[in-house]
């Protein structure tokens, strides 16, 4: 567990650097989607969640579901760094026969969900919380959904289910980067007012800067104990931290190459070296 915020911020940069290396070497990967949720995932694994590295299926652990599963590459360096993958582990990202693909697989230690189509992970998370509550477990389930993912009807079915069943052990992080592949969400199909919509379905809601680890941690610590599920809307930018990719359209699913890749890696490396 990391207790110092500056150290945690530096860890975010370290994880981003390793994530970008994986995608650059593979020539593919959802870099921008991974980077918009990097601070959320890092704060979860290094500060917020309870788990046992040497016992990945410990019954009282907190669970994490990356519903916007194409961004799962950000979790691989974290699992490696924490020791879930064993000593001297190698992440063979996008290689034939490797479990480390653009979408997560449960066969990877520490991964709770084999991902695929959008809109599925939140329903899985709701089912987990429902089962945990039947067993009187206090374990929490954290899930990241994308704002573009909110165009899936199954997301709203899951939200309705969570509110109706008072799934208060559910914490949803909504990665509000306001972008899809080709346009901004509010141009394509308006999502706002998202906070009001979640509250109408019986959720507690908060809104934070999704690139501020301290705000993310404080939001989890301030969750009301009132029997309601929770949504933390995280305002983010796709590709945050890479000048050539941040908040840029048509960068979805694209790994930088050549000079752009070199500049991106240098940009992150400089922040790491400066302790940011």
Regions found by a protein language model. Give the residues of each.
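N-terminal capping segment at the start of a domain
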Residues: 12-28, 175-177
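Thiamine diphosphate
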Residues: 110, 114-224
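Histidine-centered active-site/metal-ligand motif
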Residues: 30, 70, 101-103, 211, ...
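Structural motif
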Residues: 27-35
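Glycine/aspartate-rich loop-and-adjacent alpha/beta segment that forms the canonical ThDP
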Residues: 213, 218-276
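N-terminal hydrophobic or amphipathic helices/low-complexity stretches enriched
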Residues: 1-15
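Cofactor-binding active-site loop characterized by glycine-rich and histidine/acidic residues
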Residues: 22, 34-164
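Glycine-rich beta-alpha junction loops
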Residues: 39, 70-71, 177-178, 212, ...
């Amino acid at each position: 567990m990391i207790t110092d915020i500056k150290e945690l911020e530096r860890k975010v940069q370290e994880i981003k650097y390793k994530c970008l290396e994986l995608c650059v070497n593979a020539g593919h990967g959802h870099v921008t989607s991974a980077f918009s949720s990097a601070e959320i995932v890092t704060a979860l694994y290094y500060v917020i969640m309870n788990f046992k590295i040497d016992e990945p299926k410990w019954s009282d652990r907190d669970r994490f579901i990356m519903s916007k599963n194409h961004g799962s590459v950000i979790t691989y360096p974290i699992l490696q760094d924490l020791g879930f993958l064993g000593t001297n582990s190698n992440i063979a990202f996008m290689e034939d026969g490797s479990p480390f693909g653009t979408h997560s697989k449960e066969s990877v230690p520490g991964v709770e969900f084999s991902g695929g189509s959008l809109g599925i992970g939140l329903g899985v998370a709701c089912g987990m919380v429902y089962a945990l509550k039947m067993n009187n477990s206090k374990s929490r389930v954290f899930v990241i959904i994308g704002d573009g993912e909110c165009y899936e009807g199954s997301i709203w079915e899951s939200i309705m289910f969570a509110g109706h069943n008072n799934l208060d052990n559910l914490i949803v992080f909504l990665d509000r980067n306001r972008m899809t592949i080709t346009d901004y969400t509010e141009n394509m199909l308006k999502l706002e007012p998202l906070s009001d919509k979640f509250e109408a379905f019986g959720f507690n809601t908060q809104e934070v800067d999704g690139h501020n680890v301290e705000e993310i941690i404080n939001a989890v610590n301030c969750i009301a104990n009132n029997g309601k599920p929770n949504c933390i809307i995280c305002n983010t930018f796709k590709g945050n931290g890479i000048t050539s990719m941040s908040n840029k359209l048509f960068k979805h699913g694209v790994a930088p190459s050549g000079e752009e890749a070199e500049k991106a890696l240098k940009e992150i490396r400089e922040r790491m070296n400066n302790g940011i």
